């Protein structure tokens, strides 16, 4: 259809302010904020990592992939000013205190930026484009936080056991379908015994494979220089500690509890990781 303008016809100017407001009003989720006073956990997961890891890394575990995930977890902990970061398999969970107010607790920004940090860090380190998705979990008390991380560690153990059993069967010549069928609905004890029969002691495997890895801030002393007094002095700095020997069960619960009273010591802005 061709529009024809008659002589003398006036084209009314568009009200830019009105249009601006109309468009802003359609950003339905922009005003969403995380509940004030709640503990926050951001969890990022690798998108399509089942196929990605199958074609780029050894199975069931690959040290290079493990290091990439730890590097990504450290970037999230530092960039977003978290308290504790935990990674297992292709996921990372980062804990933030109730006082955390980065991005004014905007849900859209938290989800998009956390996914971006994870994707960019892994991609830059591995030189292959990958994507992470992100979600937000909220807790109202310390017990829920402890339960969350115990839940994720239990998932790490389950996935590690299933992974070792599956790939052992595949190496023995079973098809993907047959290996899955043989393990379906089998008990934890059955799978442990299956590995033992084939020379693999699950409990002797590297701890990070079945308990995950924790990252958190630690203080250390560093020699500095005081120009006013013209002498060297000892100063306290903080850096990220990578813990691949995490405890489990009740000891892990107490380990997590130890981080939950550190809110006042967390950075409000800037980067505190200093090697």
PLM segments and residue spans:
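Regulatory and interdomain segments flanking nucleotide-handling catalytic cores
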Residues: 3-275
């Amino acid at each position: 259809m061709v529009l024809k303008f008659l002589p003398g016809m006036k084209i009314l100017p568009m009200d830019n302010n009105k249009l601006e407001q109309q468009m802003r009003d359609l950003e339905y989720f922009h005003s969403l904020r995380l509940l004030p006073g709640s503990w926050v956990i951001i969890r990022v997961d690798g998108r399509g990592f089942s196929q990605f890891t199958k074609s780029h890394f050894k199975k069931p575990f690959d040290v290079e992939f493990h290091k990439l995930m730890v590097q990504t977890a450290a970037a999230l902990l530092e960039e977003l000013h978290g308290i504790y970061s935990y990674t297992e398999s292709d996921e990372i969970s980062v804990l933030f205190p109730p006082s955390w107010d980065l991005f004014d607790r905007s849900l859209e920004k938290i989800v998009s930026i956390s996914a971006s940090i994870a994707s960019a860090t892994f991609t830059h380190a591995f030189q292959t484009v990958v994507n992470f998705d992100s979600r937000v979990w909220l807790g109202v008390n310390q017990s829920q936080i402890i339960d969350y991380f115990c839940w994720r560690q239990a998932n790490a153990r389950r996935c590690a056991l299933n992974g070792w059993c599956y790939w052992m069967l595949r190496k023995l010549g079973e098809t993907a379908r047959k290996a899955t069928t043989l393990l379906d609905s089998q008990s934890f004890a059955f799978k442990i015994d299956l590995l033992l029969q084939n020379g693999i002691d699950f409990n002797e495997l590297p701890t990070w494979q079945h308990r995950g890895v924790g990252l958190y801030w630690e203080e250390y002393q560093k020699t500095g220089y005081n120009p006013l007094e013209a002498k060297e002095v000892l100063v306290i700095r903080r850096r990220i500690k990578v813990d691949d020997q995490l405890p489990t069960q009740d000891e892990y619960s107490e380990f997590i509890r130890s981080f939950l009273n550190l809110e006042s010591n967390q950075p409000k802005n800037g980067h505190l990781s200093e090697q």
